C-alpha cells in the first residue's frame, strides 16, 4: 500500500465536507491499491484513473477541521497510474485542482466543464488496451446513464458513490 503524506493548507481553496468523506476516501485508497497492484503486471498497455467530479483536491472535515486529500490527489500520489483524467465543473475548484495536481503528478489531464459532456473527450485520451478505474462521486444526482455507458465501453472499473443524503 502506498503512503500518503499529510495534506497541508496551501492557501488555496479548501471546501468543507462531512465526516463521511474520510471513510469514502479510506475505501477509495484501498480500492486503488488493490486495483493497481493486481492489474499492473497484466496484459494492459496502461492503467488510467478517471475522476469526473474531482473537486479541489484537498478538503476540510467540518466537525474536526482536519484536512483530507480528495480523490484526485489520492490517485495522483499513486505511481502505478500511467495517466489521470480529471474533470471539474466549478471554475474555482478547477483552477485550484490544476495547481495542486501539477505539484504532485505530470501525468494528469484536467478538464473544466460538465462531466456528462467532457466524458467523450476524456475517453479519447485513453489508449486502446488500457484499463481504467473511474471514480464517480457526483454532486447530487448529476450523473447521466449515457456517461456510465461511455466509460463501461472503455474497459473501466466503475466505483460510484451515491450519497443517501447531502449535507
Model region roles, listed by residue range:
Residues 1-24:
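Basic, amphipathic N-terminal segments that precede the first structured/catalytic domain
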Residues 119-133, 139-167:
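Class I S-adenosyl-L-methionine
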Residues 24-121:
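SAM cofactor-binding core of SAM-dependent methyltransferases
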Residues 20, 58, 107, 130-133:
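N-terminal start-of-chain detector that recognizes signal peptides
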Residues 14-18, 87, 137-138:
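Short, charged/polar micro-motifs that form catalytic or ligand-binding hotspots
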Residues 111, 135-136:
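Small/polar loops that bind or transfer phosphate-bearing groups
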Amino acid at each position: 500500500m502506498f503512503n500518503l503524506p499529510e495534506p497541508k493548507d496551501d492557501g488555496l481553496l479548501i471546501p468543507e465536507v462531512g465526516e463521511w468523506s474520510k471513510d469514502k476516501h479510506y475505501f477509495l485508497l484501498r480500492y486503488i491499491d488493490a486495483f493497481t497492484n493486481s492489474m499492473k503486471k497484466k496484459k494492459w498497455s496502461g492503467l488510467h484513473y478517471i475522476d469526473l467530479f474531482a473537486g479541489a483536491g484537498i478538503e476540510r472535515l467540518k466537525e474536526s477541521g482536519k484536512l483530507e486529500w480528495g480523490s484526485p490527489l489520492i490517485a495522483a500520489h499513486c505511481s502505478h497510474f500511467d495517466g489521470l483524467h480529471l474533470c471539474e465543473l466549478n471554475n474555482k475548484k478547477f483552477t485550484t485542482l490544476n495547481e495542486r495536481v501539477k505539484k504532485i503528478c505530470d501525468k494528469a489531464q484536467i478538464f473544466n466543464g460538465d462531466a456528462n459532456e467532457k466524458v467523450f473527450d476524456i475517453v479519447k485520451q485513453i489508449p486502446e488496451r488500457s484499463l481504467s478505474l473511474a471514480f464517480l462521486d457526483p454532486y447530487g444526482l448529476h450523473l447521466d446513464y449515457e456517461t456510465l455507458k461511455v466509460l463501461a465501453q472503455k474497459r473501466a472499473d466503475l466505483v460510484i458513490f451515491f450519497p443517501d443524503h447531502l449535507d
